[in-house]
Regions:
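N-terminal pre-Walker A segment at the start of P-loop NTPase domains
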Residues: 31-41
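Acidic, Mg2+-coordinating active-site environments of NTP-dependent enzymes
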Residues: 3, 12, 16-30, 136-218
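Phosphate-binding loop of NTP-binding sites
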Residues: 40-175, 181-187
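Residues at the C-termini of beta-strands that transition into short coil/loop
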Residues: 37, 88, 194-197
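General small-molecule cofactor/ligand-binding pocket signal
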Residues: 34, 85, 192
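Generic structural signal for well-ordered secondary structure
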Residues: 3-4, 39
Length: 218
């Protein structure tokens, strides 16, 4: 399928057995084939290497809700100054984040990545690939409790992004939720609060809807 779709290379941990590859495009004139022990691990390592070749600012966005909208807004703002890569759709897991990072090139000045989680440790792992310098926490809520167990586990998992931000970086926290505000104790980076309760920081209020556009005032 990859060859038929025009792929010039294939990364795989399983070559087709004799007869199974007939008509697949593999062969002397087909795509280059790289065989590895684990194709997912290889994908992640390639993505991490590509990220380390880039000087682009990396912004990680996580939270139980609002990741996509927040990512799109950050992309729009940073796009005023740089060429910005962003996660396509909801590419926010152990496959989607590496695929996004592989798109990072010399022309990009920044990257905005959604970081999702299905269990404790997922965000920490993704940060190990992406090395974000800025982190944004939207909100913590009782989502996916079938895998997390309780709200404290969700909070701890989202906090993994805060813990990954270097001291020279910046963390943006939702001032309207105590569970998110408490994450400030987990970082030595600069902390910027946003929300209705964010006095002296990033406070904004809905001004209204005009012609299909939402207007805010800060």
């Amino acid at each position: 399928a990859a060859a038929a779709g025009g792929a010039i290379g294939v990364l795989t941990d399983a070559l087709p057995r004799d007869g199974e590859g007939e008509g697949s495009g593999f062969g002397v004139c087909g795509p280059d084939v790289i065989v590895v022990r684990d194709s997912l691990v290889a994908l992640q390592r390639l993505a991490s290497w590509n990220r380390q070749q880039s000087a682009a600012l990396c912004v990680g966005v996580t939270g139980s809700v609002g990741k996509t909208t927040t990512r799109q807004m950050i992309h729009a703002v940073l796009g005023e100054q740089w060429s910005v890569l962003q996660s396509p759709a909801n590419y926010n897991n152990e496959i989607g984040v590496p695929l996004t990072l592989l798109e990072l090139g010399p022309a990009h000045g920044a990257a905005v990545l959604e970081l999702g989680a299905g269990r404790v440790g997922d965000i920490r792992f993704l940060c190990g690939l992406a090395h974000p310098e800025w982190g944004v926490i939207t909100r913590v809520s009782a989502c996916h409790l079938e895998s997390f167990g309780d709200l404290s586990a969700v909070q701890a998992t989202k906090q993994e992004l805060v813990e990954a931000i270097p001291g020279s970086g910046c963390v943006f926290l939702n001032a309207d939720q105590a569970e998110v505000c408490a994450m400030s104790r987990a970082t030595s980076a600069r902390v910027v609060y946003f929300g209705y309760q964010a006095e002296g920081s990033g406070r904004c209020a809905l001004r209204g809807v005009e012609g299909g556009r939402i207007r805010f005032c800060s």
